[in-house]
Swiss-Prot record:
The active site is at D739. InterPro entries: Aspartic_peptidase_AS, B_retro_matrix, B_retro_matrix_sf, dUTPase-like, dUTPase-like_sf, dUTPase_trimeric, G_patch_dom, Gag_p24_C. Residues 103-148, 550-570 are annotated as: Disordered. The lineage of its organism: Viruses, Riboviria, Pararnavirae, Artverviricota, Revtraviricetes. GO terms for molecular function: aspartic-type endopeptidase activity; DNA binding; dUTP diphosphatase activity; structural constituent of virion; zinc ion binding. It comes from Sheep pulmonary adenomatosis virus. The gene is pro. This is Gag-Pro polyprotein. Transmembrane segments: none annotated. It catalyses: dUTP + H2O = dUMP + diphosphate + H(+).
Amino acid sequence: MGHTHSRQLFVHMLSVMLKHRGITVSKTKLINFLSFIEEVCPWFPREGTVNLETWKKVGEQIRTHYTLHGPEKVPVETLSFWTLIRDCLDFDNDELKRLGNLLKQEEDPLHTPDSVPSYDPPPPPPPSLKMHPSDNDDSLSSTDEAELDEEAAKYHQEDWGFLAQEKGALTSKDELVECFKNLTIALQNAGIQLPSNNNTFPSAPPFPPAYTPTVMAGLDPPPGFPPPSKHMSPLQKALRQAQRLGEVVSDFSLAFPVFENNNQRYYESLPFKQLKELKIACSQYGPTAPFTIAMIESLGTQALPPNDWKQTARACLSGGDYLLWKSEFFEQCARIADVNRQQGIQTSYEMLIGEGPYQATDTQLNFLPGAYAQISNAARQAWKKLPSSSTKTEDLSKVRQGPDEPYQDFVARLLDTIGKIMSDEKAGMVLAKQLAFENANSACQAALRPYRKKGDLSDFIRICADIGPSYMQGIAMAAALQGKSIKEVLFQQQARNKKGLQKSGNSGCFVCGQPGHRAAVCPQKHQTSVNTPNLCPRCKKGKHWARDCRSKTDVQGNPLPPVSGNLGEGPAPGPETMLWGNTAGSKRTIADLCRATRGSAGLDLCATSYTVLTPEMGVQTLATGVFGPLPPGTVGLLLGRSSASLKGILIHPGVIDSDYTGEIKILASAPNKIIVINAGQRIAQLLLVPLVIQGKTINRDRQDKGFGSSDAYWVQNVTEARPELELRINANFFRGVLDTGADISVISDKYWPTTWPKQMAISTLQGIGQTTNPEQSSSLLTWKDKDGHTGQFKPYILPYLPVNLWGRDILSKMGVYLYSPSPTVTDLMLDQGLLPNQGLGKQHQGIILPLDLKPNQDRKGLGCFP
C-alpha cells in the first residue's frame, strides 16, 4: 500500500515539475516510465530524496541496459523523459536566456545605463523530492497526450549540447549576436560610450564535435571545452617548445617551485638531478667548498618555501651539520621577523620558518613575494656559516695524465678538481703547477723537466701541446734505430736548440760526454791520471801547488809575502736579502743563524722557497740553505716550533751530527689539511747540545752524506715462509716474492693494470719453465720501497703466474746482501774493526780477506806479528 502511494506521489511531483517548464505529460506514461526505471534499477529509492547524483546513476543503468539488450527493450520515450527530469534537477547554464536579457537592456540605443548590466542569477533548483503517500490523481486527455509527445520530441533538440547540430537554434543565436554587435556599433556612431566591463558578453567558445548517440540521449555528459592556456613569457614559450622538440633545457633554471598563473599560484617539486648533484658536492668537497656554495647560490634564486629548504638540507647534509644549519636558519629568520615587525611587513617568524599554522606546504604558497626572498637569504646565510668539513676530499694524486691523453685536457681536469677544493687561488696555482709535472706521463715529464722551476702552467701547456700518440711512436722508433733507450732519446731531444744543433751547455758530462750526470759526480773522473804536486816551492811544508798555498810562514818560520793574483770571487754588489739572519744567495753556516729572543734556546730555521704540503704528499724535505759543520763539541737537535704545530705543520725531529757538512734540511708533513709555507717562514729550530763521546768509534767522517739513516739495513731472516716485499710502482702497490735467480722481474697478468701499455718482447724467457715472445712493459716503470730505495725497470708480464717475482734488476738497486755468517767469526772480526763491505785496515784500504799471519822467526817469546 505504501509503495503505491509513493509511486503516485513521485508521478505527481514529476508532473508538477514538467508543467513548471511548460510541458504536459500524462500520468500513464510517467507510471510506465517509472516501472521501467524500477525494472532496470532495483535499488531505486522508494523512500527518501532523489537528487541529481542519483538520477545520473539511473542514466548509467539505462545506458548499460541499452547496450546489452538493444533499442527494442527500451521504450521510445525513456531517453526523453530522463533528459527532461535531469534538466529539472539541474539549472546550471541557460545561455540563450542570459543573451535575451542582455538584448532587452540594449533595445534603446540612446539610453545609457547608469550601471553595468548584470546577468540574472539562475533560478535555484527545486527542492528534493520527498516520498510520502498522496491520494491526488491527475489524468490527461488524448489531446494533451499528443501535445506532450510533440513537446518531448522538441525538448531535447533545444538542449545546449546540440547547438552545433541544430541549424535552427544556431541561426537564432547567430542572429542575436549579430543584432547585439549592430546595436553596439550604432551606439558608438551616436557618440555614446558604453561603460567598460570585463564581464561583457565574451566571444563564443568553439563548438564541440559531433556527439555520440548516448550523449544525444543525455546519458553521457557532453565533452567540455579545453582549459584556458597558461600565461607564459616569450622565453618560457620558447623553452616549452624546445622541450617538446627533444632539446635539453635543464640548464635553464627558470621554473620556480612556486608559480603564478592567472592570479593563482601552484607548486612544483625540485628536480631530482639538482638535489643529486648538491648531495655529491657536499659528500666529496664539503658543504662550504666553493663549488657547493655556488650551487646553493644558484638554488637561492628560486622561490623556495621553508619546507623545501629544510628537506634539501636534511637530504644533503650530515646529521650534525643539519642541526647546526637549522638552528642558524631559525636565528636568521628571527632577526628578519623583528625587522618586518618594525616596518609593518606582514611576514611573521612562523611564516619564515614554516612552523605552526604554516607547517603544511599548501599554506606556504600564499606568502607575499618578498617573503620567499627573505627565506632564501636566511637559508643561504645559515649554510655559509657551517664549519669547514673534515671529511676526506677527492684525492688529488688520482688525477693523473693518461698515456694518450692530451696534456691540456689533463691540466683542465686538475684545475677543475683543485678549484672545487681550495678557495685560495694563489695556493691553488702553486699546487697545480707542482702536480702538473708530478702527475704527468713520462713523455711530458721529460719535456717539462728543464723548465720545471722557471716556467708556469701556460709554458707547460705550450711545451706539451704536440706530445701525443704519434710523438711517442716516433720516439720509440728513434730509440730502436739508434740503439738507445727512450730516456736517452728524450734527453737528446731536449739538448737541441731551435736550429736543430746540439747545445753546448746541456750536452752532458764534460768528462765522459755521456748524458744523465754532471762532471762533479762522473764515475770516470777518478779513473783519469792526475799529476800529484811535489813539495811546495813557497813554504816547503807540504805537497801542494803554490797557487793553493795559504801558509803565512815558511818551514823555518820566516813570514811569507801574500800570494799574487786574483783572489776568490766575492759576493755581487747590492743590498743583502736577510731571512732571519741568513743572507740569501750565499752559503750560510750555523754562525749566520739568529735567535728569536735573548733567552731562546734554539736557532730558528726557515724554508727557502714557497711550498704547498698536502696529506697525500707525506713527509717532504725542505731546504734551509744552512750548511754544517756544527761548532766543535756540539751536536744539533732539529725540533719544531709551537707556532708551526698550531698551524698543522708536523716537523719530524732529527739529530744533526757534529761532523755533518751538508745542507741541513727539515722533514715536514701536513697530515690533516693543505698547508702553505711561504719563503722565509720560521717553522723549525736547531738546539745545540754538548757532544758526549762514549763507546767505540769508527774512524771516518760523515762529511756531506748521510742525511737521514745511512747505516740502516733491511734484514729478513730466511724461514719457511716466502720472502715477500711490497713495492710502489707508479703510484700502485704490488706485493711479490724475492727471486735471486731471476734476471728481470716478472709481474702476473692478473695484477697488471689494464691502462698500462705493454708490447710483445722478441726474446725467450727461461726459468723452471719456458715461454716464447712474452709481453713486456712498453715504458720504464719507477719503483720505490718503504725504505726509500728507488729505480726504474721494464718487467715482463706473464699470464697464469700466481705471484709477482722481484728479480736481480730490483735487488741490486736495493743493495741486498746474501751471506751466512758464523757468529764466532763475526764477533771476532767486529772487535778488530771490521766494516761491512770494506774489510779490515786502518785506512780502509779494502782488505776483505783475513791477513796471512806469519810469526817472526828472529825473536823468541810470545811472538810478534808484522
